[in-house]
Amino acid sequence: MAVSAGSARTSPSSDKVQKDKAELISGPRQDSRIGKLLGFEWTDLSSWRRLVTLLNRPTDPASLAVFRFLFGFLMVLDIPQERGLSSLDRKYLDGLDVCRFPLLDALRPLPLDWMYLVYTIMFLGALGMMLGLCYRISCVLFLLPYWYVFLLDKTSWNNHSYLYGLLAFQLTFMDANHYWSVDGLLNAHRRNAHVPLWNYAVLRGQIFIVYFIAGVKKLDADWVEGYSMEYLSRHWLFSPFKLLLSEELTSLLVVHWGGLLLDLSAGFLLFFDVSRSIGLFFVSYFHCMNSQLFSIGMFSYVMLASSPLFCSPEWPRKLVSYCPRRLQQLLPLKAAPQPSVSCVYKRSRGKSGQKPGLRHQLGAAFTLLYLLEQLFLPYSHFLTQGYNNWTNGLYGYSWDMMVHSRSHQHVKITYRDGRTGELGYLNPGVFTQSRRWKDHADMLKQYATCLSRLLPKYNVTEPQIYFDIWVSINDRFQQRIFDPRVDIVQAAWSPFQRTSWVQPLLMDLSPWRAKLQEIKSSLDNHTEVVFIADFPGLHLENFVSEDLGNTSIQLLQGEVTVELVAEQKNQTLREGEKMQLPAGEYHKVYTTSPSPSCYMYVYVNTTELALEQDLAYLQELKEKVENGSETGPLPPELQPLLEGEVKGGPEPTPLVQTFLRRQQRLQEIERRRNTPFHERFFRFLLRKLYVFRRSFLMTCISLRNLILGRPSLEQLAQEVTYANLRPFEAVGELNPSNTDSSHSNPPESNPDPVHSEF
């Protein structure tokens, strides 16, 4: 794909002549200290015309083209994975009763076959962008479907998906096809031609904003004090740091303070020549770590691809010049670029300078307005107050990455029949494909409205919907995020007004976090604790599972009344007091103090503890028999302990079956841990191959349906079954964790077993 032609190749001496000529056309070199430091003089900013001339200064297109190629390539990989092409039929299957969460309620997904067409157009656009083929059209073909899919589902929003759309939008207006592109092969005027400086300025400014605003957001007290990503330091990637530091100090100094300093300084380190090598090292190390720490798709690689934009624009030519001469025929041009109408050239000897035209002024205006808008949006939450909850603004465009971590203890959805008054409960997340609605008032309103349309099909008329959702943010108390007394179907919500039924985050209780950690660390390994904060006038109805044989409630602050429903008894607790709770029964905790109450459940899962003791006994017995210290024969039902599996004979007890399953699980974990790198890498490639294979086959099926019509259901079922096959993987590799790496909503595990309610 190299944009090379025989006439375009030159000798080293002619390269030097062309380079000198290009420099002469571009104007005098910056010899002042400011010019060397910033790349321009203060006088270049003294008037609009000078600024336009600066932003349209002819610049080497090589680095921009490399970024275009890499970004397009990464989007080609992203579409089947994080955009969800491989699992599109599961998300948009026709006829599903599913509650969706678009930005605008008028946005609706197309029928499934047409959604595959949308994704096909997006994929072809990304491919054309990468190759520089029909470049401007390819950018539009990628951009429009991308933003349609993005706006169609708020539950998939995040900072990096938003960034991809911004970068594609910027590239649409740039001349990134002036180097290393098919368009350059077909059009001599575009081949190896200058691009205006603003092409680089916009991209560099965008990446600078991503880093710097992310750093400013990390000045939040929760991040500085080390509560945002408290458990991240347990990852093996931080093992080298833990040779010198404790896990707590690694979390505080490396994860939190190190992340803060890196984000604040990365843009500056990359901008200045003297510090760029340091910046490239640290941001590369940072993004390589992130690619292993988080499931963030192509984000780490896009940021790695953007880093060379801060280097000298001609760095690809210098790289090509070091390659063997024969290989250079297959690589991009290393000759100096030719003039372009997109740029403004300063006067050379004996010639007057070029006056900026309308296109040059539009390019400069676009640069300034776009960067100002990007600086404003992360702080525009005062306009979109309806999207403010415990954290401000829409999710994705604020660059507050990893600042807030949440844990959900309890979610209860209650419906009331508007005519009969009958009460009922819904499984949390019913009719949805996501868990994200639990934290956002706008999604909760959409969910309630959707449920009010679906429940009449199940003989619930005029349904009223109530949500009781308990969340802990950054290791605080579990507390309600929404008022459970409000019917969300009828509740008012506006994107521009504060949502009245969002409960405030109890910031006054934040200092309790240190005390809560002390309490946790003082408990033994078999004792669990849940910390609760509740508002005056509200109560918590809870059930203690029969497995939790030793459960107590202790008041930390305020005053509560505990009602034992079955015994019809009430007991008031004041600060420091506690009481035992009977297992297998309901109880209610009423907050009677004028200020929020704080209390904790302390419990031991006695059933689990007994099981662990029994399994430990079986393990000890197995080891004794194997080393010869146990001479007596094992009963027939315990023989599988030695054989590792059931081979006929009496049916082993449930305890023995549990022991065998655990042993098999531990052996599989050990086997995977000791698997050589090349086998792990091969398994990784097979999983990715399945994703792309299924994406391709399902797309072909849908496009065939659009062109030729749908075949019989039996044939469709056979085709989908074939698309679901994993012909490249061994049977042993087929486990639920391998089903589809692109699935954006894995099942949610219960974080604490204090039962279905808590």
Curated annotation (Swiss-Prot):
The species this protein belongs to is Homo sapiens
What pH dependence is recorded for this entry? Optimum pH is 7.
Protein name, as recorded: Vitamin K-dependent gamma-carboxylase
Q: Which disease is it linked to?
A: Combined deficiency of vitamin K-dependent clotting factors 1: VKCFD leads to a bleeding tendency that is usually reversed by oral administration of vitamin K.
Reaction catalyzed = 4-carboxy-L-glutamyl-[protein] + 2,3-epoxyphylloquinone + H2O + H(+) = phylloquinol + L-glutamyl-[protein] + CO2 + O2
**Sequence positions bearing N-acetylalanine:** A2
Q: Top EC class per UniProt?
A: lyase
Per the UniProt topology annotation, the Cytoplasmic ranges are 2-60, 135-136, 314-361
Q: Write down a Pfam family by its short name.
A: HTTM
